[in-house]
């Protein structure tokens, strides 16, 4: 099964660099959380069946350039080797590249204006980034460590800027944010999402 091959390859890429999520969870925990959200809500923005493998690849591999020492070309080749066609591999690699943080000394430098411009310009990247944030917020809220409590506060403080930075500037559904995902993140952060999608 194509999706299972993609999932397994993403897990292996992060395991190969001994990356963990939190203190002791395998990084696959986070990757699966992001992919599960994309699979559940992606139909709202994924308008073509042939894009599904690329979007799911993007979800599972979204941190692979940043954390697993892969290059853009590595990602594209990996997608092809797993069974995506050339167009799908390009779409997948573009999502992963868009979600790769910039070089920077601070969080603000690593995810600045240019970073979010790249996400907004890349089909399906806004949704995958939103899924990534939801997965990270969920995890932070469930953990007892000071670090995770601090990150939960950071995510809450960043919320207005984060949403504004992801909000689509086009009617292209591929750049959209599934309404249910946005409202889910609002609920997790304890912020009011009423009226957000009203004309």
Regions found by a protein language model. Give the residues of each.
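Active-site helical microenvironments for divalent-metal-assisted chemistry
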Residues: 1-199
């Amino acid at each position: 099964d194509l999706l299972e091959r993609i999932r397994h390859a993403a897990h292996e890429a992060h395991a190969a660099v001994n990356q963990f999520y939190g203190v002791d969870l395998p990084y696959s925990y986070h990757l699966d959380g992001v992919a599960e959200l994309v699979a559940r809500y992606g139909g709202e923005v994924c308008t073509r069946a042939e894009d599904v493998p690329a979007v799911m690849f993007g979800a599972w591999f979204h941190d692979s350039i940043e954390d697993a020492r892969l290059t853009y070309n590595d990602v594209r080749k990996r997608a092809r080797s797993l069974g995506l066609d050339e167009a799908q591999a390009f779409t997948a690699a573009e999502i992963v590249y868009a979600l790769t943080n910039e070089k920077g000394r601070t969080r603000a430098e690593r995810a600045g204006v240019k970073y979010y411009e790249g996400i907004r310009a890349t089909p399906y990247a806004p949704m995958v980034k939103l899924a990534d944030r939801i997965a990270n917020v969920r995890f932070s809220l469930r953990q007892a460590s000071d670090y995770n409590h601090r990150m939960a506060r950071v995510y809450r403080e960043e919320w207005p800027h984060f949403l504004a930075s992801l909000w689509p500037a086009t009617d292209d559904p591929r750049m959209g944010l599934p309404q249910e995902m946005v409202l889910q993140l609002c609920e997790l952060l304890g912020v009011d999402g009423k009226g957000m999608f009203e004309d």
